[in-house]
Amino acid sequence: MAARCVRLARRSLPALALSFRPSPRLLCTATKQKNNGQNLDEDLGHCEPKTDPPSADKTLLEEKAKLEEQLRETMEKYKRALADTENLRQRSQKLVEEAKLYGIQGFCKDLLEVADILEKATQSVPKEEISNNNPHLKSLYEGLVMTEVQIQKVFTKHGLLRLDPIGAKFDPYEHEALFHTPVEGKEPGTVALVSKVGYKLHGRTLRPALVGVVKDA
């Protein structure tokens, strides 16, 4: 009896094994589900936000801004240097021109002494003695006058002008007051007497005129 039961059990084992073996269709479906799960995970992984590095356009814009700032600073420095150079050129040119104009001041002052002597010489000659009866004195006087006129022409040619301000308003930049005195019929503050004429060189007072000024009585 026992041996019969054993034989029946051996015969039933293959059938039971087949009943528990999964079918190919089920295996294929499981494989597809597994693959779909992996693909879904990969898709979800691709959808995760990522931090991108700075783009090339942004870098180029930053470099452009830096270069523009450097260019602006360089242009400002260039303009300042150009302005400084122009100012220096103008100052140098002005100094050269002033040296040309006023470099002869010392020489002119020496010539003024000669002009003063000529003026005093012509003024010292008695006018009543200048006649044909005294030809030597007349010739000498006329020679002095011609020399004085000629030297004044030379002065004018080189920008040296004579100041004889008799009757003019007193100007402290051109006149030097030796005294103040009331003068009848004269306006106070005007020049009543010129003791020594003055001179201007190219508009600048070289020697002030020595004068007497009218004051209120």
Swiss-Prot record:
Region listing for Disordered, in residue ranges: 37-56
Modified residues (N6-succinyllysine): K94, K120, K215
Transit peptide: 1-27
Listed SUPFAM superfamilies: Coiled-coil domain of nucleotide exchange factor GrpE (SSF58014), Head domain of nucleotide exchange factor GrpE (SSF51064)
Gene Ontology molecular function: adenyl-nucleotide exchange factor activity; protein homodimerization activity; protein-folding chaperone binding; unfolded protein binding
PTM annotation (N6-acetyllysine): residues: K94, K100, K215
InterPro entries: GrpE (IPR000740), GrpE_coiled_coil (IPR013805), GrpE_head (IPR009012)
Swiss-Prot/TrEMBL GO biological process terms: protein folding
UniProtKB keywords: Acetylation, Chaperone, Mitochondrion, Transit peptide
Gene Ontology cellular-component annotations: mitochondrial matrix; mitochondrion; nucleoplasm
Chief location: mitochondrion
Compartments reported by the entry: Mitochondrion matrix
Job description of the protein: Essential component of the PAM complex, a complex required for the translocation of transit peptide-containing proteins from the inner membrane into the mitochondrial matrix in an ATP-dependent manner. Seems to control the nucleotide-dependent binding of mitochondrial HSP70 to substrate proteins.
Assembly and binders: Probable component of the PAM complex at least composed of a mitochondrial HSP70 protein, GRPEL1 or GRPEL2, TIMM44, TIMM16/PAM16 and TIMM14/DNAJC19. Binds to HSP70, HSC70 and HSJ1B.
Family according to the record: Belongs to the GrpE family.
HAMAP family assigned: GrpE
The protein's name: GrpE protein homolog 1, mitochondrial
Organism of provenance: Mus musculus
Gene behind the chain: Grpel1
